Amino acid sequence: NRIRVSGSFDTPVFSTALYHQSTFNDLFVKGLSVTAGLRLEYEKMSMNYFSDSNIDFDFFLKMAMPPLNIPFRNLNAAPLLEGKEKNDYVQLLPKLAFKYDFSPANNMYVSITRGYRSGGYNVQMFSELIQSDMQQKMIEAILDKAPESMAGMIEGMIKQHMPNYGKELNVQETTVYKPEYSWNYEVGSHLSLFNGKLKTDLAAFYMDTHDQQIAKFVNSGLGRMMVNAGSSESYGVEASFLASINKNLNMNVSYGYTHSTFKKYDGGTTSSEEQIDYSGNYVPFVPRHTMNAGANYSFFFDKSNWMQSLTLGMSYTGAGKIYWTEKNNVSQSFYGTLNGRISLQTKALQIDVWGRNLTNKDYTTFYFETMHRGFEQKSRPLQLGVDIRYHF
């Protein structure tokens, strides 16, 4: 049998902001610039919700000792959730950056910014709420129909097997997730060396995040929800190098390291009422290492030739280790893929022959758990293809 559940949700968002940024050049010494900015943002959001259902059912109370078989027929439960949630937030997001140009193409910088990510509503949680309300209404219908002498016994049995029975549904607590805030600190340098033949970007960063938003599956496994996971910190380094050896050959290498962990994350309780604490665990879906290395060699031909250029390119891309869960019990180790491309350019036509994952590397690109089972999305195997572009 099917049970009809209706739902109507309206989630308007209004936001407005004032922003100012000023840069002061050659402050105190030549080449030193200071940038200061401030963003004032107001965001107002609301959710008008209506969800209801209706079910006719029969209930049979059966016991072996003493022998008991009492039918409760023609019962009805009509769960209803209707109302409005309103939330508004005011943010001050400052920015301060120092940059020193020690030559026209080389500089060092330090920046401090405050980041913000909007909150919202987990509308999909209403499927859980309406189910809970339906259970409550069905139990109330049974108790209303039961003889007064048996109502207490039945209610006691229900509470024994359903500890959440009688608890008031809290729509706001269940559906609302708060904004995420972060303080971001970065120091780095942009360098152009050997007459521009080598360009380098170097950076080190630290992020202090509060009310971090994490996506997770709901208890029923039917849908995902956003939750605020306490606080986390991330720090790391990034480096990239682009070398133009000559007009034919260029090479690039980049590397990033990120250490991202929860400082505080209360994961609730288990079925046995044990506290779950993920503090100190790695933040899921954040690769510890990322890297890329590539080279392109181009052959250039006379403009009178029908073929203007032919470029051969190879690249290697890697990432890992990546944790998939807050428990840190499932992960993907470091992996890398080899890719290649041959590009033919004429005056009006470009033909690219490419290959991805040339070594047919097997790895996991995504993982999630629902209904006590784990599911993973595997990588794409070796791929070959051709792209054709015609310019007119």
How does the language model describe each region?
Residues 107-111, 130-227, 233-235, 256:
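Membrane-embedded beta-barrel scaffold of Gram-negative outer-membrane proteins
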Residues 2-9, 21, 78-85, 171-176, ...:
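Extracellular loop and loop/strand-boundary signature of outer-membrane beta-barrel proteins
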Residues 116, 315-325, 343-392:
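C-terminal beta-signal and adjacent terminal beta-strands/loops
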Residues 10-18, 38-48, 88-94, 112-116, ...:
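Transmembrane beta-barrel architecture of outer-membrane proteins
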Residues 29-34, 105-108, 195-200, 248-251, ...:
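Repeated loop/turn-to-beta-strand initiation elements of outer-membrane beta-barrel proteins
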Residues 28, 197-210, 225-325, 389-391:
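Gram-negative outer-membrane beta-barrel transporters
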Residues 1-103, 121, 163-170:
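Signature of Gram-negative outer-membrane beta-barrel scaffolds
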Residues 20-26, 90, 98-102, 114, ...:
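Residue-level signature of outer-membrane beta-barrel architecture
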